[in-house]
């Protein structure tokens, strides 16, 4: 999303903006058409060419620079909502206001202080990251989070929230995976649709992004993704299709990358043929900030709004229009969609801006959401939940310096955050004061040593404190349970690394080994809490500990939410929306991630940030074999499979009832809580297709459902519907979605590898659907 503004203001941008204004009549004429009063086409007809070009460019924050594209045209985002990403261009004489656009995926990203209000703060709620929200498998919960996010945007005068992000988790080292939902397109699309519905219920627009196949950061502005049409349609576009059809986002944001040689923002096939003609999208398409290479091609392809609008783009469009190389009707078409967007906004309706969102209420929603998406990966010897009154020894930097979310445009300026230490103490647990004081001093010292970095980048991790043998032995004697946290963070521009990120550092391995040995010698359990934004390796160390809680990056209420789950105030019910492999090399994308440079040395070898200046390419040789579609089809052993998650109680699945309807089917099943604690269960439905000329995964997720909170002994009937399209694969040879004749297997289970019931049905004649 928007790159960090340059530090210096660009005088030429202000001069150009001023000259543009001079080409516009200075005083509104009563005879002039006005937006919202006159027909939109009359308003467009009254615009000068310069105004038309200005309107399709948008505006950025003053002083922002786009590198080779030059400085932006200007804008009032900082004066309207400081820290917002940009605005559209206003034309006062025609009644056209500028509207405000702001990040981000886990909460509103704006500046918390303002020069004109020194005694007031403008914080936003930091909600859990998307990967955690998806792990709840709860569309209604995600919609409530969206409602809260939309309410904050409305309170601060933001018209379009630049979220949700729904690219697939193709590979664990993608540094923005925390912004995205899953390795599966159905989960991604359903979660994104829920988020969109929630935000837009507050009369605030959304921008589903990054369309499409934007799966890593390395060379993101130039990378060419070589991918089959089948993989595109079944995986990388499918989530967007679901979101568009189920929630009608006001805008779509194109990605930086190219697909099969064409920038996404310059692709008529992506923007017109697929998005508009096939899916029926009626909103605005905008670029990511400074994306693409040719403004004229972007306009012609149907990328309506170029953000944040640069001088070079402005000049290119003006020249092309004057020379007849850009049909003005193309501009008019794109402008009409932009004006339709503007008329939907609160700004256009002159809605008041309170600057007073209900942060307390939203913090409660954030806390609840965080608890629902945490995943219990391991729990031996009833190590969890923690009994009341237990004394706890907290090891690990992030237990005391919590990681609530990722960096870059996904960051949020929250009013506070709660550490695990604070959350457990608030929940009534005693903690080892000497140990926590040692960590506090270590963190303070290491932060003072750390050089100041670009705030848009993830800071380098602090070296992990390794307590002495004496300190660990003393803790094992004085405390009842050891809690070890493992923390990870990432964000824009730099993808994750294998060593010391996907794999534990040597210090972390030593910490787990030493603490486990001491506490187990004393007959006491060891619990690991994963405070991470993406998948890591667990197989090499999990046998040393008794329990593992995947807490993700849980937002500002992190410590309270973690304590809620560890104490059983909330029974964990989250399940994985990604596969945890045994090793990084087990992912098929490991073969050539992140890609290769086509000219010059490979900058990835030095860990450099490469944004604009190198041609690069990556071939998606894994094709449709992403995530569990690979692991389960090839029979690859994994650490934890897709859909997996434990509970403090047990659930029994009754017999499945399958009913065929209109070429699709409905499956129902009764789930009963047979344990001793109240809890929720997530049930997943997979479909296996017969062999055909196309390679097929062993099974694919086609539906899911989540029970309400079931008390011990209570049951609930869950019903899941699969439409005919859910049985089909895309056959590029005939350019159709096809369900071949033969026997189909429907599997219902607690994970992709914990199938409880199966049923079969036959299709006699081929079913097909033309895009």
Locations of regions flagged by a protein language model:
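Extended, solvent-exposed functional surface patches
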Residues: 7, 20-22, 26
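Glycoside hydrolase catalytic-domain context in secreted enzymes
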Residues: 2, 28-729, 738, 743-748, ...
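Bacterial N-terminal signal peptides
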Residues: 11-21
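Short beta-strand elements
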Residues: 754-769
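Bacterial N-terminal signal peptides that target proteins for export
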Residues: 2-12
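Short beta-alpha junctions and helix-cap segments that line functional grooves
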Residues: 732-734
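Intrinsic structural disorder/low-complexity segments
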Residues: 12, 24, 212-213
């Amino acid at each position: 999303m928007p790159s960090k503004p340059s530090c210096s203001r660009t005088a030429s941008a202000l001069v150009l903006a001023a000259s543009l204004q001079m080409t516009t009549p200075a005083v509104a004429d009563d005879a002039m058409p006005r937006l919202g009063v006159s027909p939109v086409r009359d308003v467009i007809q009254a615009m000068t060419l310069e105004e038309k070009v200005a309107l399709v460019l948008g505006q950025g924050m003053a002083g922002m620079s786009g590198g080779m594209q030059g400085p932006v045209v200007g804008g009032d985002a900082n004066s309207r909502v400081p820290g917002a990403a940009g605005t559209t261009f206003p034309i006062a004489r025609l009644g056209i206001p500028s509207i405000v656009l702001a990040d981000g995926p886990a909460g509103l990203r704006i500046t918390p202080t303002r020069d004109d209000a020194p005694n007031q703060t403008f914080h936003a709620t930091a909600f859990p990251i998307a990967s955690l929200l998806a792990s709840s498998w709860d569309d209604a919960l995600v919609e409530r989070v969206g409602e809260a996010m939309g309410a904050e945007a409305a309170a601060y005068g933001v018209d379009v929230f630049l979220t949700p992000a729904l690219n697939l988790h193709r590979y664990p080292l993608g540094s923005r995976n925390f912004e995205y939902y899953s390795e599966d397109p159905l989960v991604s699309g359903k979660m994104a649709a829920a988020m969109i519905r929630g935000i837009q219920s507050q009369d605030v627009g959304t921008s589903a992004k990054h369309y499409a196949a934007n799966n890593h950061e390395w060379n993101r502005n130039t990378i060419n993704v070589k991918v089959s049409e089948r993989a595109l349609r079944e995986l990388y576009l499918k989530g967007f299709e679901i979101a568009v059809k189920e929630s009608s986002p006001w805008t779509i944001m194109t990605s930086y990358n190219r697909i099969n040689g064409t920038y996404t923002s310059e692709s008529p096939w992506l923007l017109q043929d697929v998005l508009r003609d096939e899916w029926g999208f009626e909103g605005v398409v905008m670029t990511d900030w400074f994306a693409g290479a040719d403004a004229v091609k972007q306009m012609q392809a149907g990328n309506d709004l170029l953000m944040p609008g640069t001088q070079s783009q402005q000049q290119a469009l003006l020249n092309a229009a004057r020379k007849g190389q850009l049909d003005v009707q193309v501009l008019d078409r794109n402008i009409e969609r932009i004006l339709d967007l503007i008329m939907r906004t609160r700004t256009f309706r002159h809605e008041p801006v309170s600057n007073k969102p209900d942060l307390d209420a939203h913090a409660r929603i954030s806390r609840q959401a965080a608890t629902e998406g945490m995943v219990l990966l391991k729990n031996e010897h009833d190590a969890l939940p923690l009994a009341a009154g237990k004394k706890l020894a907290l090891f690990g930097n992030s237990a005391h310096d919590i990681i609530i979310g990722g960096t870059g445009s996904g960051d949020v300026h929250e009013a506070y955050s709660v550490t695990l230490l604070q959350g457990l103490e608030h929940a009534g647990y005693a903690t080892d004061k000497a140990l926590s004081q040692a960590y506090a001093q270590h963190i303070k010292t290491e932060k003072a040593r750390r050089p100041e970095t670009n705030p848009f980048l993830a800071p380098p991790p602090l070296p992990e404190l390794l307590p002495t043998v004496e300190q660990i032995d003393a803790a094992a004697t004085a405390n009842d349970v050891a809690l070890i946290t493992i923390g990870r963070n990432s964000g824009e521009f730099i993808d994750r690394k294998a060593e010391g990120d996907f794999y534990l550092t040597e210090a972390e391995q030593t910490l787990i080994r030493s603490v486990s040995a001491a506490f187990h010698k004393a007959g006491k359990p060891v619990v690991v809490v994963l405070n991470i934004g993406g998948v890591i390796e667990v197989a090499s160390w999990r046998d040393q500990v008794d329990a593992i809680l995947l807490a993700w990056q849980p937002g500002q209420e992190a410590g309270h939410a973690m304590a809620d789950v560890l104490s059983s105030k909330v029974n964990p019910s989250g399940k994985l929306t990604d596969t945890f492999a045994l090793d990084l090399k087990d992912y098929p994308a490991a073969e050539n991630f992140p890609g290769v440079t086509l000219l010059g040395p490979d900058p990835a070898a030095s860990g450099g940030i490469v944004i604009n200046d190198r041609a690069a390419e990556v071939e998606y040789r894994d094709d449709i074999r992403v995530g569990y579609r690979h692991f389960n089809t090839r029979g690859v052993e994994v650490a934890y499979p897709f859909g997996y998650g434990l509970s403090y109680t047990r659930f029994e699945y009754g017999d499945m009832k399958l009913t065929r309807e209109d070429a699709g089917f409905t499956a129902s099943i009764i789930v009963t809580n047979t344990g001793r604690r109240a809890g929720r269960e997530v049930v997943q439905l997979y479909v296996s297709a017969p062999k055909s000329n196309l390679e097929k995964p062993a099974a694919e997720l086609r539906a899911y459902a989540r029970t309400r909170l079931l008390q011990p002994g209570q049951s609930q009937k869950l019903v899941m519907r699969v439409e005919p399209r859910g049985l089909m694969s895309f056959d590029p040879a005939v350019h159709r979605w096809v369900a071949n004749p033969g026997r189909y297997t429907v599997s219902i289970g607690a994970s992709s590898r914990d199938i409880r019931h199966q049923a079969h049905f036959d299709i006699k004649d081929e079913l097909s659907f033309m895009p």
